[in-house]
């Protein structure tokens, strides 16, 4: 099974998402949002091809259905690298993944 690795930017994205939701819906509900996102990412371990193809070469995108986020990812050397976790309105050309 592939090992999930969050890039520093993906971890920073999660922190920002938590901070945003904490201010809007409270700490516990913000934590529930993050838990839901992480559970969706775990699904990729079993089904790494389930994300849609991206315009970025060698990258797929997991579209989160419960919350308005997209998680671009790629498989590299036995790792499932989560590159970012971004609002669905952000365009791939604006994504800084490195």
Features from the language model and the residues they span:
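Amphipathic, soluble alpha-helical interaction motifs
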Residues: 16, 20, 43, 47-50
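Basic/aromatic recognition patch in beta-strand/loop cores that engages polyanionic ligands
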Residues: 38-39, 46-79
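Solvent-exposed interaction patches of small proteins and small membrane subunits
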Residues: 32, 55, 59, 90-96
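Enriched for short, Lys/Arg-rich terminal
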Residues: 69-70, 74-98
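Generic leucine side-chain signal with a strong bias for well-ordered alpha-helical environments
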Residues: 6, 14, 41-44, 80-86
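Arg/Lys-rich, positively charged N-terminal/basic patches that mediate binding to nucleic acids
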Residues: 1-34
């Amino acid at each position: 099974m592939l090992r999930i690795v969050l890039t520093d930017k993906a971890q920073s994205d999660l922190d920002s998402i938590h901070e945003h939701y904490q201010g809007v819906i409270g700490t516990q509900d913000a934590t529930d949002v993050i838990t839901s996102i992480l559970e969706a990412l775990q699904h990729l371990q079993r089904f790494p091809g389930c994300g849609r193809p991206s315009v970025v070469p060698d990258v797929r995108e997991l579209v989160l259905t419960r919350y308005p986020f997209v998680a671009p990812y790629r498989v590299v050397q036995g790792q499932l690298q989560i590159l970012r976790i971004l609002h669905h309105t952000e365009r791939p050309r604006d994504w800084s993944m490195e």
